[in-house]
Amino acid sequence: MPAFDIVSEVDNVELKNAVDNATRELATRFDFRGVDASFELKGENIKIKAEDDFQLSQLVDILRGNLAKRGVDARAMDIKDAVHSGKNFYQDIDFKQGVDTLIAKKLVKEIKASKIKVQAAIQGEQLRITGKKRDDLQAVMALVREGDFGQPFQFTNFRD
């Protein structure tokens, strides 16, 4: 029986490249000359630092642009609130890895409501979709792409 998995993961190499490119762009920007601003990548967490709240939003925009250039979906970003400490503002950005249980349940509910003849099973941080016809599986892929679940999804392990 044909099957595939729905996963949500961020490529760490592309994430590192995007942060490096954003740091390079930050060094060449005229409005950040003489300003203490930086990006710091630790695992799947990026810590940004700037002297002003407005500059933090500019840094997030720079990062979003570089993520888009590298093919990383910006919907995977989980932006925390800005923290003011001393003369600097700090902000943490986490990246969502894996399909959260609540989102997985919402996906299963949406797939069942569409009346497509497939079975959806939650397996840890991924969803396994199984059906008799490849066309049904492709219809589920289109349904997931169209839906707004607040998280990007990838389709892996397609079996015939």
From Swiss-Prot:
Gene3D superfamilies linked to this entry: 3.30.70.860, YajQ-like, domain 2 (3.30.70.990)
Keywords per UniProt: Nucleotide-binding
Pfam family membership, one: DUF520
InterPro entries named among the record's database cross-references: DUF520, UPF0234-like_C, UPF0234_N, YajQ-like_sf
CDD domains, per the entry: YajQ_like
Superkingdom, natural source: Bacteria
GO cellular component: cytosol
One Gene Ontology term of the molecular function aspect: nucleotide binding
Signal peptide (residue range): none
Family, per entry: Belongs to the YajQ family.
Full protein name: Nucleotide-binding protein VF_1240
Protein source organism: Aliivibrio fischeri (strain ATCC 700601 / ES114) (Vibrio fischeri)
Record lineage: Bacteria, Pseudomonadati, Pseudomonadota, Gammaproteobacteria, Vibrionales
